[in-house]
A protein has these predicted regions:
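Ribosome-associated RNA-binding proteins
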Residues: 1-175
Length: 175
């Protein structure tokens, strides 16, 4: 009986350590760091804005944006913001998307279509980074409207959010 209590206490004592070990590893990719300034009465105050995409390369992806006085802190804050905005998307066996989708954000419009195995990620700019970090290996994407990196990344995320599987469609139709 006492040995069981000791094991239980060990588990409780090391619970924080165990939680950190089980946390999934995320891949972080920096889209852009820009220098921004705020004009005040005393002059211009410079800071940095970081746009980061992070995902587990297995169907989870998020975009984070943050500002800070230096680049390192902006990057860290953007990573935490990206973790708050994670979405999960369904992937097919060929690591493609299940169907065509269109994502919009602001003036940006992203058209994504599934591709056959071996074709790779055919996309440009921020959309390519979002798809690679999400774990999509075979897809064709086209950017329309704007070249803004942040808006294109968010449009890609909104398009990926709309993806559904066959079972989800069946459930929706049956109920």
């Amino acid at each position: 009986m006492s040995s069981d209590l000791k094991q239980l206490n060990k588990l409780k004592k090391n619970s924080r350590r165990n939680n950190q070990l089980q946390e999934p590893k995320f891949v972080e990719r920096l889209i852009k760091i820009s220098r921004v300034s705020k004009v005040t009465k005393g002059g211009k105050k410079l800071s940095f804005r970081a746009i980061v995409v992070l995902g587990d390369e297995n169907g989870k992806v998020g975009v984070g944006v943050a500002k800070a006085d230096d680049v390192v802190n902006a990057f860290k804050k953007a990573k935490t913001d990206g973790r708050k905005n994670l979405i999960t998307l369904p992937l097919t066996k060929s690591l493609s998307i299940p169907h065509d989708t269109v994502g919009q954000f602001g003036a940006c419009k992203i058209i994504m279509k599934p591709a056959i195995e071996g074709s790779g990620v055919i996309a440009g700019g921020a959309v390519r980074i979002v798809l690679e970090v999400a774990g999509v290996k075979n897809v064709i994407a086209k950017q329309l409207g704007s070249n803004n990196l942040l808006n294109n990344a968010r449009a890609a995320i909104s398009g990926l959010e709309q993806l559904t599987t066959k079972t989800e469609v069946e459930k929706r139709r049956n109920s």
